[in-house]
């Protein structure tokens, strides 16, 4: 099974979700090493892209080493800045532009972007049309089922987005007001699937092959998008692809290979962000990798401020660990 977006093929149809502060270039490269159909950048605010700040532009870097298509996700409330940001991102090497209409965070919806766009479909469609018209790239859309249980309008917006030129639609099976509580309603995604002919991808609570299979069965979707399930497990998408789509089983790191892998990711973060910011960002990834480690060792790793000391702790924590 393959998802086609114009000339691009997303094979396998197991995609990495955009996650703010997580799916940066170092993490996307780690996922790409094991395999995925697509990796998506963390959300980039369109207005900030126009400022040319290096820290913002870094979020939209698209260079990978495994030949995977890369999508850059843009968020914003107004059509013109979104269109201009899309042009910039295209010039930087993105192969796909994704529009964020699903982020539930108050700091995003309070600015009338993210999932808040679902409350005003006419305005959202003007924004979508502007982005589609600005670039010669496939444009995709990620959204939720609706704002709340009284506004379940994902199918309506999806149909209009397809007419505007959107090539793929990803649905997180919750409303904005649910945030991440309760369970994702994969069956509700089927209504969106029935409303459009472009590929629909299921997202939300997909953490392993079993949940991916249930999501596909219940939604009828063309593929799955994995977010939190990949935290601390960049190989998770490849495992799902092997179980469901006949891809080769990924070779998972174990023993010294595992500590080498975590060390490489840690050093890549420091190289990308610089020492001080990199130390802060690396801690969450180390925390996910170290969930099975002894509590005192894990706590010491979270407190460490010296890279050499942290690398020694990584070797101590992971030298006998096996990926799962």
Swiss-Prot record:
GO MF annotations in UniProt: flavin adenine dinucleotide binding; tRNA binding; tRNA dihydrouridine synthase activity
CDD domains (alphabetical): DUS_like_FMN (cd02801)
InterPro entries (alphabetical): Aldolase_TIM (IPR013785), DUS-like_FMN-bd (IPR035587), DUS_fam (IPR001269), DusB-like (IPR004652), tRNA-dHydroUridine_Synthase_C (IPR024036), tRNA_hU_synthase_CS (IPR018517)
Domain of life: Bacteria
Gene3D superfamilies given in the database record: Aldolase class I, Putative flavin oxidoreducatase, domain 2
Family to which this protein belongs: Belongs to the Dus family.
Entry protein name: Probable tRNA-dihydrouridine synthase
Reported cofactor(s): FMN
Keyword Transmembrane helix: no
Binding positions (FMN): 18-20, 73, 142, 203-205, 227-228
């Amino acid at each position: 099974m393959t998802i086609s977006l114009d000339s691009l093929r997303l094979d396998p149809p197991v995609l990495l979700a955009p996650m703010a502060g997580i799916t940066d270039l170092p993490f996307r490269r780690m996922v790409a090493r094991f395999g995925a159909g697509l990796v998506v950048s963390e959300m980039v605010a369109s207005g900030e892209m126009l400022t040319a700040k290096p820290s913002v532009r870094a979020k939209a870097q698209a260079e990978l080493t495994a030949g995977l298509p890369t999508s850059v996700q843009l968020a914003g409330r107004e059509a013109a800045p979104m269109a201009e940001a899309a042009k910039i991102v295209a010039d930087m090497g993105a192969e796909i532009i994704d529009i964020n209409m699903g982020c539930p965070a108050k700091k995003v919806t309070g600015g009338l972007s993210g999932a808040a766009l679902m409350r005003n479909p006419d305005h959202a469609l003007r924004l979508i049309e502007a982005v589609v018209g600005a670039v010669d790239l496939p444009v995709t859309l990620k959204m939720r089922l609706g704002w709340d249980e009284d506004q379940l309008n994902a199918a309506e917006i999806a149909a209009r987005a397809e007419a505007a030129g959107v090539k793929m639609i990803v649905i997180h099976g919750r409303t904005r007001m649910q945030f991440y509580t309760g369970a994702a309603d994969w069956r509700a995604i089927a209504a969106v699937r029935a409303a459009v002919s472009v590929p629909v991808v299921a997202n939300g609570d997909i953490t392993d092959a079993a949940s991916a299979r249930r999501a596909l069965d219940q939604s009828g979707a063309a593929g799955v998008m994995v977010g939190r399930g990949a935290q601390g497990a960049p190989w998770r998408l490849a495992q799902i692809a092997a179980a469901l789509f006949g891809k080769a089983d990924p070779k998972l790191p174990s023993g010294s290979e595992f500590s080498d892998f975590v060390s490489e990711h840690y050093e890549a973060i420091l190289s990308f962000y610089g020492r001080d910011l990199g130390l802060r960002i690396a801690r969450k990834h180390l925390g996910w990798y170290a969930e099975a480690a002894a509590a005192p060792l894990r706590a010491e790793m979270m407190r460490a401020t010296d890279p050499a000391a942290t690398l020694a702790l990584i070797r101590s924590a992971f030298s006998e660990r096996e990926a799962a």
